[in-house]
């Protein structure tokens, strides 16, 4: 169960980061519609990662090895990725 949660969490983290990065690229290109769509997917991936973050904590009862803790911690930084993408989208909208 724990291994499954870790794999799913890693997938959602990667998806959130990838879609947020691609949203930033589309914003810089002036393709607002695509940037919004990509940012929406990134936000959904973050929500899934948040749920898995909580599941992992409950399943492990706070006993995580170093590798698991790194992944656990990385999921807590996804807000920054989304904020960067939102900022770039707002800049693109003002052009």
What name fits each language-model region?
Residues 2-95:
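Long, low-complexity or tandemly repetitive, helically biased scaffold regions used
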């Amino acid at each position: 169960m724990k291994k499954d949660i870790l794999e799913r969490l890693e997938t959602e983290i990667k998806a959130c980061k990838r879609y947020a990065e691609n949203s930033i690229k589309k914003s810089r290109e002036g393709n607002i519609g695509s940037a919004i769509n990509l940012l929406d997917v990134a936000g959904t991936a973050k929500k899934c990662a948040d749920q898995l973050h909580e599941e992992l904590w409950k399943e492990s009862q706070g006993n995580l090895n170093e590798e698991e803790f790194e992944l656990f911690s990385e999921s807590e930084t996804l807000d920054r990725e989304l904020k960067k993408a939102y900022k770039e989208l707002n800049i693109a909208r003002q052009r």
